[in-house]
Amino acid sequence: MKHNNQLPVAQLRKHQQFRIKTFFNQAAQKKARLHARRAQAAAVFPRPTEKLQPVVRKQTQRYNKSTKLGRGFTLQELKAAGISAAFAQSIGIKVDHRRKNRCQESLELNKKRLLAYVSKLVLFPRHQGKAKKGLVNDTADTSSAAQNALQTSVPLPSVSKREKAVSNIAELRKKKVYRIIRQEKTNQKWDGKRKAKAQAAAEPKA
């Protein structure tokens, strides 16, 4: 309810109760989800229950200072870490062929994330006694002795840092930072058309 309006009087009929969605099974559904999570953890044991995801920036200028887990690693990040896309998907790494790396920082961050995951990885041979060599060497041990209680192998890093106090507050307040950023974006947007217009004006008219 908003504003100073009169309260609505719902003149309901008995047959209208079937058009209302109820959730009397909320506690039972909560229990079912718990059993499903346990069944999934038992099925993928000794692997983590979640696959490895990249660290990405949130969208829009308002939220892009914080990070979150993305959909999957780019092909450039996998190539930098020396992992093929097919092999990555087989060892619990999510791959997103649509995402692109816009800066070197994100590429290096996720490359380190991949290498940290691979350094912790323990692979067991598909066929007993036939271990393979590669980026991650197979072990001769059986998987029965392995233990893994982690939900995810490489958690999301905490990037929040406490800012140091500065003394030149008065000078900083005089600068209209948002206006400067918007002006630079506008200049970048119209740079091509302005150059074309200047070039057309500089050419001699026939």
UniProtKB/Swiss-Prot annotation:
It comes from the Eukaryota. GO terms for cellular component: cytosolic large ribosomal subunit. Belongs to the eukaryotic ribosomal protein eL13 family. Residues 184-193 have a biased composition (Basic and acidic residues). The keyword Secreted does not apply. One of its GO terms (biological process) is translation. Residues 184-206 are annotated as: Disordered. One of its GO terms (molecular function) is structural constituent of ribosome. The gene is RPL13. This is Large ribosomal subunit protein eL13. HAMAP family: Ribosomal_eL13. Keywords: Ribonucleoprotein, Ribosomal protein. It holds the Pfam family Ribosomal_L13e. InterPro entries: Ribosomal_eL13, Ribosomal_eL13_CS.
